[in-house]
């Protein structure tokens, strides 16, 4: 069983809301303070939590009080009054903090994603980003604290809902910005995040919150198949028409096939040399296609043709379309988005009398609950040994299966 978490963001997401939801789930505030102290910036802030109510519902509000500015009270992501730091400086702070390995890795990834987005907005390299949004003390505490909390809970996979756009404008270090702010839009663009308008005309998603969600979440949209064990509620600062609470569901995966979103590209061709088809296949696989195949079809004027079908991740649609337009004679491509169920796939090695062979094992569940559905030796490994020893491919294939069954 995998431990799953699902970020439900009806009123958006911010770093302090993430911390609040984690503390609400049981992450000790003392644990966070203890490990955050390793960053060497604990003189710049005070971290504490309290129970609050939002539209009648109770949640946990985490405060990051900046001691460098005693008048600071709204903790808004864009109004930092703490030291500005470059990305390399923050990376060094994190590496030197002796954090748990997962928390360190996640923290570095979140900051790099945030710097990538901010750099793209301002037209500079990520490592040269030097302004409030990345360097502020509360952003560091929010991001590293969230990663510490997720690690403390033992989360294996994080998922996230669609995000509300919000509206209006917000004051930032670079002036007055429209909501959603440019960095948030760029982060959404990088992960193709589904968004919607919930009618609330305020900033609902901050760059820090967006960076955490877009970096650490496996998928966006509806919740994964899971048994919900507990829900943590992290309170935002503003009073909104609906409860301003980030809801973090904690649970275990259920024994059902995993779901993933894929894109299907299709085009009909009747005037391309058959010799080119093989090259098109290779080019599509090189840019990230998951599968490519053709079907024989009849076309206009009774001409025989092919239906070229490409299955790829949603973020590979553009590059796959470019290959198809460049390498074929088609004038148009159909694009479908579908969901597919997949089994867990693992690669194991087995030893035969002629050498080692990789074996792909398809299963569902883990440990005592694991159920194996299919075992297949890798074609290329079998072919290489068959050629090397001048024996039939099927013999190597059979020996590999026998080795797996006897392992």
Swiss-Prot record:
Single annotated GO MF: nickel cation binding
InterPro entries found in the cross-reference section: Ni_insertion (IPR002822)
Annotated keywords: Nickel
UniProt KW Aminoacyl-tRNA synthetase keyword: no
Domain of life per record: Bacteria
Disulfide partners: none
Keyword Kinase: no
Family: Belongs to the LarC family.
PANTHER family: NICKEL INSERTION PROTEIN-RELATED, PYRIDINIUM-3,5-BISTHIOCARBOXYLIC ACID MONONUCLEOTIDE NICKEL INSERTION PROTEIN
Protein's recorded name: Putative nickel insertion protein
Organism: Gloeothece citriformis (strain PCC 7424)
């Amino acid at each position: 069983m995998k431990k799953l978490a699902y970020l439900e963001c009806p009123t958006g997401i911010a770093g302090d809301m993430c911390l609040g939801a984690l503390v609400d789930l049981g992450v000790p505030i003392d644990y966070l303070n203890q490990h955050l102290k390793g960053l060497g910036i604990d003189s710049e802030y005070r971290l504490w939590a309290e129970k609050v109510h939002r539209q009648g519902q109770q949640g946990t509000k985490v405060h990051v009080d900046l001691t460098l500015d005693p008048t600071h009270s709204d903790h808004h992501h864009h109004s930092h009054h703490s030291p500005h730091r470059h990305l390399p400086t923050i990376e060094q702070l994190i590496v030197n903090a002796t954090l748990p390995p997962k928390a360190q890795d996640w923290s570095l990834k979140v900051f790099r994603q945030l710097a990538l987005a901010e750099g793209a907005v301002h037209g500079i390299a990520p490592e040269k980003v030097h302004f409030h949004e990345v360097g502020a003390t509360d952003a560091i505490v929010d991001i590293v604290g969230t990663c510490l909390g997720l690690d403390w809970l033992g989360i294996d996979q994080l998922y996230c809902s669609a995000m509300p756009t919000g509206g209006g404008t917000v004051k930032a270090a670079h002036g007055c910005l429209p909501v959603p702010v440019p960095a948030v839009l760029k982060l959404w663009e990088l992960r193709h995040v589904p968004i919607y308008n919930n009618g609330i005309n305020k900033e609902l998603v901050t760059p820090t919150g967006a960076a955490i969600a877009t970096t650490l979440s496996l998928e966006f949209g509806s919740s994964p198949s899971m048994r919900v064990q507990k829900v943590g509620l992290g309170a935002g600062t503003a009073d909104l028409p609906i409860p301003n609470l980030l809801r973090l569901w904690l649970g275990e995966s259920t024994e059902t096939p995993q779901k993933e979103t894929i894109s299907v590209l299709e085009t009909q061709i009747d005037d391309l040399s058959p010799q080119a088809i093989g090259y098109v296949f290779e080019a599509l696989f090189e840019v990230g296609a998951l599968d490519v195949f053709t079907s024989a079809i009849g076309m206009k004027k009774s001409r025989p043709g092919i239906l070229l079908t490409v299955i790829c991740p949603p973020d590979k649609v553009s590059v796959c379309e470019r290959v198809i337009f460049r390498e074929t004679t088609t004038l148009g491509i159909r694009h479908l988005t579908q969901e597919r169920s997949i089994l867990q796939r693992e690669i194991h090695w087995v030893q035969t009398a002629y050498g080692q062979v990789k074996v792909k094992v398809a299963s569902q569940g883990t440990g005592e609950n694991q159920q194996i559905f299919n075992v297949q030796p890798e074609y290329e490994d079998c072919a290489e040994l068959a050629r090397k020893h001048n024996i039939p491919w099927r013999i190597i294939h059979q020996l590999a299966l026998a080795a797996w069954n006897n392992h």
